[in-house]
């Protein structure tokens, strides 16, 4: 009983410590999310600029390589930030967190809520599983960025091919009309030359 009373006396201080640690974690998580969103926005802006421009093949290939390198750097930065966010709790705080988990599990059992059970199960996941989840999210973001860039490059290539074909057709029509006009002029000149000797013989 005395141990329980000692725990109850220390809980306000420990809760303040745990709350401070949780607030720091939450602030770090928000900062990393904000930085990740800024990186995603920058990459999407670059992909939009790639969509509007139609560079030659070599320049387009260089830009694709640069954007892939930037996407990989962004992925690495996100993974590094997730590693830095992962911090260890002091032993007293861990004990208090475990006690709170036990209390919440008991409360969930008494209420029988599915959401509470799911939340407590997520809290029980080890840190390496949470880190794996963050890595998967970073990989997925990188995949989406690469997919967007690939679609932009394909759109630009399609537009270039269409324009070349339309230009060739237009030039082909013009060439055909010019040849027809010249041929008609040649025919008229040859006819007029034939008529001139005949007309001179009549005079």
From Swiss-Prot:
Residues 1-111 are annotated as: Disordered. Keywords: Coiled coil. Residues 13-82 form a coiled coil. Residues 1-12, 39-51, 74-86, 96-111 have a biased composition (Basic and acidic residues). Residues 29-38, 64-73 have a biased composition (Acidic residues). InterPro entries: IQ_motif_EF-hand-BS (IPR000048), IQCF (IPR039887). Disulfide bonds: none annotated. Residues 129-158 form the IQ domain. This is IQ domain-containing protein F3. The lineage of its organism: Eukaryota, Metazoa, Chordata, Craniata, Vertebrata. The gene is Iqcf3.
